C-alpha cells in the first residue's frame, strides 16, 4: 500500500511540475548588465558637478516580453548620499548596443523619492577593444509608471548626455 501511495504522489508531483517548467520563459533574448560610475564636470546642464555616481545593473528580457533584473544606484547631492534599489519592470535594446532600463523603486534613502516611484536610464555598450570609445550612460530619471513605460518603449536618444562612464557596460540584443 505504501508503494502505491508513493507512485501516486510521484505522478501528482510530475503532473504539476512539467507544465510549470514548460510555462517558464526560456533564456533571455536580450540583456544588459554593468557596473559603472561617471563624473560630469562643470559647466553642465545641471549647474552642479556630478561626481562618482555608481550604478550597478542586470536586466533580462524574455521571448514572451517579460523582464527580470534589478539595479542599484548611489547618488550624492550637495554632499548628501542617497541609495536606491530598483526592480526592473521594462527593458528594451535599440541599435544593437543601447539598452533602456526602468523599474520600480523598492527602497530609497532619499525622503523625496518614495518606494513605489519609478526610475530609468539608458546605457551604451561601445565595445571592448582598446580603441573602442568609452561606454556611456544617461543619468537616472525618476517619475511615475507611465513615464517609465514611455521611456523604455521609445527609441529616442537621451535628452541630456549620454556621458562617458568608467566601468563596463554589456548589452546583448
Locations of the language-model features?
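Extracellular protease catalytic domains of secreted zymogens
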Residues: 32, 37
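Bacterial N-terminal signal peptides that target proteins for export
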Residues: 1-8
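Bacterial N-terminal signal peptides
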Residues: 8-19
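Extracytosolic secretory-pathway proteins
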Residues: 98-100, 105-173
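Intrinsically disordered, low-complexity, compositionally biased regions/tails
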Residues: 38, 69, 73, 83, ...
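Cleaved targeting-peptide boundary
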Residues: 24-31
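Predominantly extracellular/secreted and cell-surface proteins with exposed
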Residues: 40-123
Amino acid at each position: 500500500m505504501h508503494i502505491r501511495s508513493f507512485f501516486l504522489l510521484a505522478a501528482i508531483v510530475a503532473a504539476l511540475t512539467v507544465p510549470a517548467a514548460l510555462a517558464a520563459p526560456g533564456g533571455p533574448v536580450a540583456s544588459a548588465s554593468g557596473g559603472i560610475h561617471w563624473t560630469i564636470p562643470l559647466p553642465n546642464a545641471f549647474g552642479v558637478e556630478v561626481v562618482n555616481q555608481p550604478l550597478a545593473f542586470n536586466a533580462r528580457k524574455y521571448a514572451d516580453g517579460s523582464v527580470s533584473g534589478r539595479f542599484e544606484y548611489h547618488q550624492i547631492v550637495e554632499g548628501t548620499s542617497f541609495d536606491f534599489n530598483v526592480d526592473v519592470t521594462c527593458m528594451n535594446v535599440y541599435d544593437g548596443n543601447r539598452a533602456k532600463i526602468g523599474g520600480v523603486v523598492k527602497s530609497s534613502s532619499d525622503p523625496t523619492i518614495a518606494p513605489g516611484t519609478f526610475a530609468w536610464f539608458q546605457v551604451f555598450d561601445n565595445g571592448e577593444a582598446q580603441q573602442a570609445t568609452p561606454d556611456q550612460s544617461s543619468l537616472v530619471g525618476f517619475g511615475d509608471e507611465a513615464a517609465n513605460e514611455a521611456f523604455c518603449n521609445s527609441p529616442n536618444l537621451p535628452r541630456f548626455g549620454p556621458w562617458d562612464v568608467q566601468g563596463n557596460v554589456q548589452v546583448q540584443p
